[in-house]
């Protein structure tokens, strides 16, 4: 049995959860999320103490694997609609900067042209000091994917550390080639 999966998921007071088979709908102050969980698990809502219990339907390996996954997905949905998620990125390098125009993030990262990224539904971009980009939303998976796309515009290089990196990310630095003496 999954050690993560056997813990019940607490539901805050402002959040409502509805089940339709394996489809879980979570509604909270920040918005609404819906997700269909994989086969092999069953979900039940305990109304008396506001918890959600995820349990495997059989003892097969696939069912046990999906048990912890499903519990974590539901917990992330509840956390997202109550508090939201955000991921910060730093732009390092001379002349590299970012700005927001409407729902579009415009990044000047050393190319001959600025790179534009349109924010998908449920994601917002915020720029501080032209070098710090904050990607925020209620869906943890979508926030992480969009932050990864922003980082992929110009990943940090190991010699000078220039590029776009996650806040707090440590870049493994390499020594440059030593010249002939």
From Swiss-Prot:
GO molecular function, one term: structural constituent of ribosome
Keywords annotated in UniProt: Ribonucleoprotein, Ribosomal protein, RNA-binding, rRNA-binding
Matches recorded under InterPro entries: Ribosomal_uL6-like, Ribosomal_uL6-like_a/b-dom_sf, Ribosomal_uL6_a/b-dom, Ribosomal_uL6_bac-type, Ribosomal_uL6_CS
Pfam families assigned: Ribosomal_L6
Keyword Nuclease: no
Gene Ontology CC annotation, any one: cytosolic large ribosomal subunit
GO biological process, one term: cytoplasmic translation
Domain of life of the organism encoding this protein: Bacteria
TM spans (from-to): none
Keyword RNA-binding included in the entry's annotation: yes
Family: Belongs to the universal ribosomal protein uL6 family.
NCBIfam families linked to this entry: L6_bact (TIGR03654)
Subunit field text: Part of the 50S ribosomal subunit.
Stated role: This protein binds to the 23S rRNA, and is important in its secondary structure. It is located near the subunit interface in the base of the L7/L12 stalk, and near the tRNA binding site of the peptidyltransferase center.
Protein name listed in UniProt: Large ribosomal subunit protein uL6
Organism: Synechococcus sp. (strain CC9605)
Gene designation: rplF
């Amino acid at each position: 049995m999954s050690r993560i999966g056997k813990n019940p998921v607490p539901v805050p007071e402002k959040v409502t959860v509805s089940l339709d088979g394996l489809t879980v709908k979570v509604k909270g102050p920040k918005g609404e999320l819906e997700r269909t969980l994989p086969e092999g698990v069953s979900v039940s809502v305990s109304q008396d103490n506001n918890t959600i219990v995820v349990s495997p339907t059989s003892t097969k390996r696939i069912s046990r694997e999906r048990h912890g996954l499903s519990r974590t997905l539901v917990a992330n949905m509840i956390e997202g609609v109550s508090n939201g998620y955000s991921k910060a990125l730093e732009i390092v390098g001379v002349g590299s900067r970012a700005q927001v125009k409407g729902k579009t993030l415009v990044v000047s990262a050393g190319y001959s042209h600025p790179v534009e990224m349109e924010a998908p539904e449920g994601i917002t971009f915020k720029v501080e000091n032209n070098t710090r980009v904050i990607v925020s939303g209620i869906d943890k998976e979508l926030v992480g994917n969009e932050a990864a796309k922003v980082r992929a515009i110009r990943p940090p290089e190991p010699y000078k550390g220039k590029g776009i990196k996650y806040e707090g990310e440590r870049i493994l630095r390499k020594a440059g080639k030593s010249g002939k003496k």
